[in-house]
Swiss-Prot record:
SUPFAM superfamilies with a match to the protein in the record: Adenine nucleotide alpha hydrolases-like (SSF52402)
A biological process from GO: protein histidyl modification to diphthamide
Keyword field contains Nucleotide-binding: yes
Protein name: Diphthine--ammonia ligase
Gene3D superfamilies: HUPs, putative n-type atp pyrophosphatase, domain 2
Gene (name only): dph6
Length: 255
């Protein structure tokens, strides 16, 4: 199938695209929903979308050599019942309009979706895909999270933490750390406090700097740390990318 990769920049959306290719599908375009330029924060109060790291999403398209379709999130979480039906002003309708445009231009048959555990997201993506006669491809759905994280790391996917929001995770200590660096500690947090190893409870979010599908790798040159909530036990903070570029993988970087 001709597939559009629905991406946030995080590990799940990128790894699911890798699974699509392994299954014989072709990723022909990427799609992303982003906050408005005038948004008060990179971190939108969205039930559906990761928006932290949106400044660098275009570099994923550059790294993969694919067209990127983007749309501003204009709606909000209006229809929050378990089942979803089309609702004016809901952020799900932004996804509908985005994928409708991609289907018209790129003649795609399927959508790569990095959902692992959220029924809320799954139901809404399936609703949009059904309305557009697109096939959702969610190879990570309900996978064991410990095994999945290990598989991501061993596949050559390199992602860093760009948001933390859980007891045991601290902006000063853990933002910018790679999944490989964090794997054992995430296991500890899971055993002690029930933290979801893949961050499916909102404990952390990531941004992918390299993976086997990338023809180039992404280099983050400069960031700033934003503290969203200075809670004494579980502070919420994220990285804002201020300077970044892509680089050929064959290049040897010198310090």
């Amino acid at each position: 199938m001709r597939v559009v990769g629905l991406i946030s920049g995080g590990k799940d959306s990128c790894f699911n695209m890798l699974q699509c290719v392994s299954a014989g599908h072709s990723i022909v375009a990427l799609a992303n929903l982003r906050p408005a330029d005038h948004a008060a924060s990179d971190e939108l109060d969205s039930y559906m979308y990761q928006t932290v790291g949106h400044q660098a999403v275009d570099l994923i398209a550059e790294a993969m050599g694919l067209p990127l379709y983007r749309r501003t999130i204009e709606g909000s979480s209006v229809h929050i019942d378990r089942e979803y039906s089309p609702t004016d002003g809901d952020e799900v309708e932004d996804l509908y309009q985005l994928l409708k445009h991609v289907k018209e231009e790129m003649h795609v048959d399927g959508v790569s979706v990095g959902a692992i555990l959220s029924d809320y997201q799954r139901v809404r993506v399936e609703n949009v895909c059904a309305r557009l006669q697109l096939q959702p491809l969610a190879y990570l759905w309900r996978r064991d999270q410990a095994a999945l994280l290990s598989e991501m790391i061993s596949s050559g996917l390199h992602a860093i933490l760009i948001k933390v929001a859980a007891f045991g995770l601290h902006p000063d200590k853990h933002l910018g750390k790679s999944l490989a660096e964090m794997e054992l500690y995430l296991h500890e947090l899971s055993e002690k406090y029930g933290v979801h190893i893949c961050g499916e409870g909102g404990e952390y979010e990531t941004f992918t700097l390299d993976c086997p599908l990338f023809k180039k790798k992404i280099i983050i040159d400069a960031t700033e740390t934003v503290i969203h909530s200075d809670d004494a036990f579980a502070p919420v903070g994220f990285l804002r990318f201020t300077k970044m570029h892509t680089e050929d993988k064959t290049e040897v970087r010198t310090l």
